[in-house]
Structures are given as structure tokens and as C-alpha cells.
Amino acid sequence: MNRKVTVVGAGNVGATLAQRIADRELADVVLIDIIEGMPQGKGLDIMEATPVEGSDSRVIGTNDYKDTAGSEIVIITAGIARKPGMSRDDLLNTNYQIVKTCTENAAKHSPNAILMVVSNPLDAMCQVAFKVSGFPKRRVFGMAGVLDSARMRTFIAMELGVSVENTHAFVLGGHGDTMVPLPRYSTVSGVPITELLPADRIEAIVKRTAGGGAEIVSLLKTGSAYYAPSASTAEMVAAVLKDKHKVLPCCCYLEGEFGIKDLYVGVPAQLGAVGIEKIWEIKLTDQERATLHKSADAVRELVSIMKL
């Protein structure tokens, strides 16, 4: 492999993501962390699995950003994880400094890279990466909607007893309690779930989707989700590296779309080799639009605290 992807942060999300990228032979992977030995050990462990997986991707772990030079994609997963009782917003001040430093280093060594942000609070951290890197908006975006939509798809499949492959869902807005699941655009084999389920069951699915991350945090007690987040990020990585022109819900910088300006919020976007190719401004009802704006207001409040 010649293509290089850097994963910043060798914690649960970062290491699992590195493994998924290598297993799918999408690129060579550089796993970087400030803790000496951890990225090297995990990188070697993942590399030693590649013969079994039939992958020729190379994986290295490092503490030196020089090893990340020339990456096509840099994925920032670094930051502290949530604990029970914490919201994603509680991570703001600590993760702001972490994401700022990671972005500065990534931009210095890979000035032409696409920056993909996974660290929470997601939408605010995207704003940090965008401002600090100076990259164009198409090359800085975040992973949230793919994960939230995957959770909603899971709950739809469980409710109806169908294959998850038959389900599609769209979740917009901020990656937090104010996210906006859209039942009208959520389907089973093309049929909207509003025609398949009563309102109370749909409401239960929407509520569980919004609390999906917190549910896992409360069960784990010592950390947060990483299997589904890493799988969701890998799907976005594949869409970029394979130039798929794939429409996925991503955290994008809006300049008037959906009536939202100068802010990162989750919306449908087309992903390809250049990053965000296009934002799909789907039609929303007045209520859906108002809910999306409420979600955006919550993100804007967080961003204002950071005084970027």
C-alpha cells in the first residue's frame, strides 16, 4: 500500500479504527499518541493480524508527528472519554486543548490532508479543527451522523424484526441530546417507518437513538462506545479514499444551508476524494427545521464558550 491515513489517539476508538482500516486494506495506517509505547504496541498487534486478515496494509505506531507526514486523511480521535453522568459537552475545555494541539501538528506535517474529527463534543471540536488548520471547509468535517443513523437503523431493525441491511435512517443536527432523527426519511426497503410503526414506537426509537451513546456509557461505567464509532468512521474513510460520491450524514460547515450560518452541524453530505463534495439541502417541515435550529443553537453556545 502507498496511501497513508493517520489516526490521532490510540485509545479504544483510535486503535479499533486503525484495525478496521487495515483489515479492509484501505491504506497504510500511522497510529499516533502521546503515551510512549501504547501506539507502537497496538500498531504492532494490528499489523500482526494482517496476514490472517489477508491485508497488505502496513500499520505503525509512533509518538512523532514526522511519521505522519504526507497523510491523505488525518482522523482525530484523541481526547478524554465520557463517564457515567457526563454529557459530551462536559468534555469541552479539556478536549479543546487536545484537538487544538493535534490539529496544529497534523496541519504542519500534512498540509493537503483531509481532517476528520471524532473527538467530543463533536460539532464544537470540528469548529476548532477548522479554525486552527486554516483548511478549506470541504477538507474538515466530523463523524457523528453515520453513527447516530446506524444506531437508529439498529433499533428500527430490532423493532420490526428485519435485516439491518433493509433499514435506512437519517439523523441530523448536533451530536448530542439535541440531535434530530428524521422518521420521515427513515425507511425499510424504501418504505418510511411512519407507515410501518405507530407514533409511540417511533418516538421510543427516536428517544433511544438520541440517548444511544449515554446508554452505552452507563452500561460500561468506565468508558464510552468504540466499536460502532470506529465502524462509522471507517465507512467515511472508505468513501473518501475510494472517491465513492457517497451521501452520508456528516458534521459540515454551513454557510446558509438550512438557514444556519458559520457553524458545524450534522447534515446530509456527499463524500468523495476532495472531501465534502456537496451538501444535500433536503426539504424539512417547519417543525423539523425548528428542531434543527434548536440543535444548532446548542452547538453555537458551546462554540462561543471557546472564543475561537
Stretch-by-stretch model annotation:
Residues 1-42:
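NAD(P)+-binding Rossmann beta1-loop-alpha1 motif at the extreme N-terminus of oxidoreductases
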Residues 19-23, 44, 48, 104, ...:
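Short, well-ordered alpha-helices that flank and scaffold nucleotide-derived cofactor binding pockets
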Residues 87-153:
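Rossmann-like NAD(P)(H) cofactor-binding subdomain of soluble oxidoreductases
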Residues 51-114:
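Rossmann-like NAD(P)-binding element
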Residues 133-139, 148-308:
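C-terminal substrate-binding/catalytic lobe of Rossmann-fold NAD(P)-dependent dehydrogenases
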Residues 11, 119-123, 270:
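Short glycine-enriched loops at secondary-structure junctions
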Residues 32-72, 300-308:
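Conserved N-terminal Rossmann-fold NAD(P) cofactor-binding segment
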